[in-house]
Every structure is written in structure tokens, then in C-alpha cells.
Amino acid sequence: MLKLKLKIVFISTVLFLFIVNSLAQTANDIKTPTEFFGFQPGDDGMLFTYDELISYLKDLDQASPRLKLVEIGKSPMERSVYIAFISSTENISNLNELQIINRELALNPNINQEEREKYINQGKVFVLGTLSMHSGEVGPSQAAAIIAYDLVTTSEPEKLAFMNNSVYMMVPCHNPDGMDMIVEHYKKYKDTEYERSSMPGVYHKYVGHDNNRDFVTLTQEDTRAIARIYNQDWFPQVMVEKHQMGYTGPRYFVPPPHDPIAENIDAGIWNWIGIFGSNLMTDMTGAGLKGVSQHYLFDDYWPGSTETCIWKNVIGFLTEAASVNYASPIYIEPTELMVYGKGLSEYKISINMPDPWPGGWWRLSDIVKYEIVSTNSILKTAAANREEILEYRNNLCKKEVEKGHTKPPYYYIITKQQHDKSEFVELVNLLVEHGVNVYFLKNNVKINNRIFSDGDVIIPLAQPFRSFIKEVMEKQIYPLRHYTPDGEIIKPYDITSWSLPLHRGVNSIEINEKVIIPFSELEKISTPIDLKSKPNFDPNAFLFTVSNNESFKAAFLAISQGLNVERLTKQTEINGNEIPVGSFLITVDKDNYGSANNLLSKLSVDPIFLEDYSDFIGEKVEIPRIALVESNFHDMDAGWTRFVFDTYYIPYTVIKPGDFEKTAFVKNYDVVVFPNEDKSILMEGKYKSEDTYYITSYPPEYTKGIGVDGFNNLMIFLDQGGIIISWGKSTELFMGQLVIKHSEEDKEEFQLPVEDHSKKLKSEGLYIAGSLINVTLTSDNPITYGMEKEIGVFSKDMPILSTSIPQFDMDRRVIAIFPEEDILISGYAEKEQKLKNKAASVWLKKGKGQIVLFAFNPQFRGSTNVSFKLLFNSLLLKEIN
């Protein structure tokens, strides 16, 4: 027996030495990051590009069985987005089996005990890490190469152990397009006085920093690629989003976050986040890394960031490293160190920052070091708690399903009869994309004395993603939390309203009385739906009702393809259905059937097909020549406007403020659009607060404003028949005394009959925290074609308008007004009654020109589809006769 034991020990020792030898040989065959890039990632002044990073990871994939690189989607600019799976050789070879285990534990509440125990015994904790989504925050992606190399070559027992029990799913860069933009900018100005300058424009095709606000609406390609990981494909148990923050505060933030927290989230999620955060604090401080903070600044109340996964039962959190100027180090005096926001009241030793950083040089290499230690800590914690985390994931699945059976609401029902059928389709498809179980009703049912019809959409709450469904389908009520009893309220970090039905203008019914709709009465929706069918005749015209947002897409696309488009100038009726003024009539014939069919293929809702359209009275629609004003100061709202315009096939030309003086507006454009941007940035290329100007961090060629002559050029355009559309802070351009200089001798001074009261009302306590506010719209106005009488509009730090009796060649009409009561629909506001009877939108006339002002974002982050038509109709305003 002793001989047998000795033999086993001998064989085991030989096998271990063989494995270690093989690993060492493999490690020797793999280039280090320094050998591959020609510098150590994190070195001062050095950055690699996205393609270089992916090339290195592809080499690791080829050289090591511990890493597998998988393409998961495309960026908006068509770069491939990847996950690098990093784990033990055995785990990498068994990824398909482990993926099945993840799915079952995440989604199946009815696993029998024996199978559940088998899954928990065999499963691994999958940790999703998404890096540098904000491209100016270069550190996490620059650290990725070192982390990957270390994990695929290590022979350290501790790291081998945590790789055996966990799988690191590293998205090496969340925003490939932005990463290359930043690297290109940095290299362009490196070794010049502008080496530390900010990159002009947004570091993304469209949305820049707001890519971390898109995980409810999923508008962007890269957002959808990342969301699919935890919505539909891999169901990781843990997620970390790695960011950077300001220069002069703590060096690193780890969880838990500060209050307020989301109230629909299970307490266990917060507890696990706390465990990961506690271990991060212990491991990082133990490694000599100073300035690590927690329970500071960042809350976890609002969905929209990558951490939206916590509403899908993932233990999700973020980390934040103090920034440098891309790859250029900064020196921080001890007297410059400070804190702000929540959780730390001074830069001192605190339970939330037990070992402050003293100041001095701070380098990209420091950020890289912090990222390496934090990543290893997260993987170590995941592996050490493997069984408990896997068990908790399935327990939470069961718990959420049980809540759906026992606690209201029990269902959300979206009826097929909607004012905007295209938004009905979009909402249903979005929920399916989120991994929500959504069903068509197959037969009529009666619930609470109301008949619901076949084709209505049923969303049961008894499903694993119950928390998410409830969060995005209900209206929001902000949870009031105070710093001290009865003291100051903790203000929201971002927005406070995100209800998908309310933001899209879709009617949704919440069922709070316990009923059971048998699954035999339901048909699961597994693929995108549409409301399309083929006509049984060859149509000569398509009629698109203006109540559907998609009808504007049809009109703009049809015109671009050479089809004739008219807008109805008279209300009509077809088969008992009212067709409102402003609807679009598109005529077709045998010569353009190809274009017509291509048009229909891009839509989700059929038009009314017509054989005879001779009774319809309309005016021909021409595509306006649109100038879209976008500053160089990371103008996200303009980027979102570009996205909405591209989505609806609306052509435009981007005009920078510095180009106004030389732009022939009268000759080349019909409409000029000003998204939400500060007047001082637009006019002078400078930040301004009250009466104080601030130096910008952009190279001087990007800081030229409109200027006096450029603005005069715009005013001449207006006076001679141009249309200006403006919302948010840019409306300040058109307040107060204005001047048109027709010639050296002919100068006209005037004031438009509109005024902004926001400064006064805010001083009296008005506060709108990114909320949905009720407005009443004027009927029978071209700007409100297709709109319901009352809608919600999104307001955050917006102007508050009123009009006055006009003079000379001016006029005004109030398009939208805040009501006297029931002002707040969803979100949080203080003293919102001060809005009552104030104007939310105003149309103005000056000379032959028109101005449309919105005291809200009509297209906020591409998510407020309920008010899109106000913008689209404004683009199509006819000239004043």
C-alpha cells in the first residue's frame, strides 16, 4: 500500500513538473507586451491603438490555450468588438458547457436539486470586465495587455487557483472607435504645448461620454454588443466596468456605492457588491496602493450604464481611477487634493478612504498598476466564493419568479391599439432584445372588467428579469434620502426618469390585482415583430399616418430615392379610420416599384395601400437643406441629434461655430438646428459660469465661436426666410436685444417676443432633476401634427419661456404649455408648480423667417421618442407667404 502511495505521489510530482515545464516553455514562446509594442504599457507618453491591442490578444490566443478571443459585434464605425476569455486551459476548452450552466442557473427556476448541485459543482464564476468605454480614460485598456499576458503565462499557485474557478471575460475596449480617436489626437499634439489638450468632438461616432447612458434604450451598436453578453448569450455572474475620474480626488474608487440605490434590486446584490468592494479595499491597500476610496460620489440608483446588468441579477459595479492627461503624467500639490459630492467631506483619513494618497507625480503607469491589482482581486474574490455565487444566482432567479407570482404588479399589458404603432413595435422588440419574456395574447381575455384582445402584448412579472421589467415599465418616484435626519436631500447623480412606455408615448397597463393568464393563451415572441402584410392588389400610393414616428422615416427615405411625397392638408377618413392632417402620401408606379419595395423593407409598420388617391389633397414635400450646429466641446446632444437624423434618413451638414462667418446660410440652407449647448461656447468658444470665463483645454483652432459677424450672418438668414430650431441652453442666443446689420449704414435692433425665466425660478427653488414633465400642446399647428393633446417632455436644467405682444415684423405662438397641476409625470422635481402656465415651446416669426424654441430636449439621448415629431415637423415647416 505504501509503495502504491509513493508511486502515486511520484507520478503526480512528475505530472506537476511536466505541466509547470510546459507552461514555462509556453511563456517563453509568448512575447511580452514590452516586446510586442516596443514599450511597457503605461510608460509616459506612450499609447497603443485598438488594432495593436487586438493584434496582441490574437497572438496570445494563438500561443496560449488559456485565452480565447471571440468577436461579439461591431462598433458604430464598423470596428470589431471582442471578448477575451481568460481562464485555465480546461475551462477554455469547456466554454460551451460552462455557457449552458450559466444559462440554466440564470434563467431556469425549476432545475431539479440533483441537476442544480451538478451545475454548481461544475460551474465557474464568469467575471465580465468592460474597459475604457470613455475613451479619454485610457488606463484600463492600456493595462489589458499586461493583465492578459500575466494570466496566460503565470505559474503562481494563487492565480492558477482563481483561474481554475473563474473565467475572466475581458472586453479589451468597450469603445474601439473612441480609443483610436484619442490615440490619434494624443500623438498629433505630443511634444507640443497642447500635448495635454482635450480631443475636440465626441470620442464615438455619435454619443461620446453618453455611451454609458444607453443600456436601457440600446440605441448604439457597441452598446447592444455588450448588453447581449448578459441579456442573451453568456449570463456572467459578476461584472465590473472600469473607468477613470478627476485628477485631484482619491486615486481609486471601489464599491459599495453611495445612496441612493435602486429599490427594485435584491438586497443580496448589494451585499455581494459590498463583499467585492471590501476585498478590493483590503487587497489594494495591502499592496501599498494609496488613496483607495469607497462609498463615495457614485450612486447606483439609475439604470442606463453598463451596470444596468444588476437589474438582470448580475453582481455589477464600477471602479474609477484618478486620471492623468492621457499618457502624460501630472504633478499634484498636496494642497490641491480635494473631495466633492457624496461620502467624503474632506480629503482626510476616513472610513471611506483609510489611506489617503499624499500628492506628487501621478502617472499612467500608476493607473495600470492599480488596474492590475484590482482585476486580480476581483477574480480572486469570485473564485473564492464560487459555489456561493453560483447558488445565489439560481436562488435569485427563483426568488424573482416567485415575487412575480405573489407581489404586484403581476403583468404589464401593451395593447396593440396605440397612437403610435411604430413605437409599439419598437418597444416590444427592445424588451425582447433585453432578454425579457414577452408574449402575444392569442385570444381575448377579461381582466378587471376590461377586455384585452388577441395581439395585445403580455409581459408577466414572474420571470428572472422581474427587477428590470418593473424598473423600466413603471413611472419613477425618486427615493428621498438625506445626509442627516431632516437635513439636505441627496441629489440625483444623473437623471430620474427612464420609463420606456412614458418616454415613447406608448400606453401600458399595470396589472396589480392577482390574476393568472394561462400560458396556453400566450404565444412567445422570440424574434423581432412588425405590423406588415402584403396587399392583395398593386397599390398606386402608400399613405403613412403622421401619428407614427416611422412615417417621417418613410417620407425622408422616399424623397431620397426619388419618390414623390406629399403631406395631406386636409383631414380624411378611410374605412372608418381618421387620417390626420400632415400624413404622408407617397405615389408609386411601375417605374419605381423597386424603390418603393426597398422603402417598405426598412419599415416595421405598413402604410395604408391605395389604388385610387385622387381625392387626397396635399402639398409636395421637399427635403430641407439642414445645417446642424455642433461645437467641438464634446457636444453629446448634437451627437445624439446626428444619430436621430441618421436613423430617420434626415440629411444634414454639420456646421461648427467658428464657420458661421464664412457660411452662406441664405444660399445653401433652409434650416439651422441648434441642439442643447451653452451660449458662451457657441458664441465665444469659452466656458462661462455667471460672469466668469474659464480657459478651455482644447487646441486654439477648435475654440473659435460664432462671433458677432457670424451671428449677424445667421440673423440675415432668419430675416430673409430661414428657419432656426433651438432647444435647451442654446435658446439663450435668441433672448434679449438682437441686431441685424444689413449694411454699414443699416442696422436693425430688435427683441423677439420671448423671455427665459429659468434663472429667476431656480433662485426661488425650482429644480427639475432630469424628469418627464407634462405639457399641453396647441392643436392644428404644423409643429404638432401627429401629436396627442398632452405628452411628457424631458427636462433637465432647461429654460422656462413666456411670450409677449410682438412688435413690427414679428409674431409668436405658444406651441406647448406647462399645465396648472399634475406637472410631474415621472422622476423628481422641487417646486415644480412654478412651471404652471409657462411656455414649453414657442414659435416665433421675424421678417420672413421662423424660429422654433423648445424648453426641453425633444430627442434626449435618443430616448424621448414621444417628442420626436415636434422636431421632425419643425424641420418641414413651410415658408411664410
Label the model's feature ranges.
Residues 25-138, 145-166, 213-214, 221, ...:
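Intrinsic-disorder/low-complexity accessory segments
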Residues 1-11:
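Bacterial N-terminal signal peptides that target proteins for export
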Residues 179-204, 208, 224, 228, ...:
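Active-site-proximal cap/loop segments of hydrolase catalytic domains
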Residues 171-175, 186, 241-249, 730:
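Short, solvent-exposed turn/loop segments enriched in Gly/Ser/Thr/Pro and often Arg
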Residues 115-117, 192-201, 226, 238-246, ...:
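Structured alpha-helical segments in the cores of large, soluble enzyme domains
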Residues 9-21:
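Bacterial N-terminal signal peptides
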Residues 148, 165-188:
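Carboxylate/His-rich catalytic cores and anion/metal-binding grooves
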Residues 196-217, 239-257:
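Core alpha/beta catalytic barrel or barrel-like domain that forms the active/cofactor pocket
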